[in-house]
């Protein structure tokens, strides 16, 4: 079992090394025609992230 653990550890180390040295994408610039429906910032839409409502619901559930 120790041999298997060592092999798995070696594979993880090698994959991590390869991932760290990977080249970036060939075209890292954003596309010229982005999706108008995509919302990259969840805080820009108040309906998407309601922290106060979440806190109130947790407090009301506990109390």
Swiss-Prot record:
Which residues are annotated with the PTM Leucine amide? 62
Provide the Gene Ontology terms for cellular component: extracellular region; membrane; other organism cell membrane
Q: Look up keyword Repeat and say if it applies.
A: yes
Q: Where is this protein found? A: Secreted; Target cell membrane
Q: Which residues form the propeptide?
A: 23-48
Signal peptide limits: 1-22
One GO molecular-function entry = toxin activity
Where does the record place its AXPX repeats? 22-25, 26-29, 32-35, 38-41, 44-47
For this UniProt record, give its keywords in alphabetical order, as a comma-separated list: Amidation, Antibiotic, Antimicrobial, Cytolysis, Fungicide, Immunity, Innate immunity, Membrane, Repeat, Secreted, Signal, Target cell membrane, Target membrane, Toxin
One GO-annotated biological process of the protein? innate immune response
Q: Which domain of life is it from?
A: Eukaryota
UniProt note on tissues of expression: Expressed by the venom gland.
Briefly, what is this protein's role?
Antimicrobial peptide with strong and moderate activity against the fungi B.cinerea (MIC=5 uM) and C.albicans (MIC=100 uM), the Gram-negative bacterium E.coli (MIC=200 uM) and the Gram-positive bacterium S.aureus (MIC=25 uM). Shows cytolytic activity against insect cell lines. Has potent hemolytic activity against human erythrocytes (EC(50)=64 uM). In vivo, peptide injection in the vicinity of the head and thorax of lepidopteran larvae induces feeding disorder followed by death due to starvation.
What else is on record for this protein? May be a minor component of E.pomiformis venom.
Family according to the record: Belongs to the MCD family. Mastoparan subfamily.
The name under which this protein is listed is: Venom peptide 2b
- The record lists the organism as Eumenes pomiformis (Potter wasp)
């Amino acid at each position: 079992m120790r041999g298997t653990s060592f092999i798995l550890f070696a594979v993880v180390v090698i994959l991590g090394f390869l991932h760290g040295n990977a080249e970036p994408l060939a075209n890292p610039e954003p596309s010229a025609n982005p999706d108008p429906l995509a919302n990259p910032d969840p805080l820009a839409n108040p309906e998407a992230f309601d922290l106060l409502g979440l806190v109130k619901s947790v407090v009301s559930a506990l109390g």
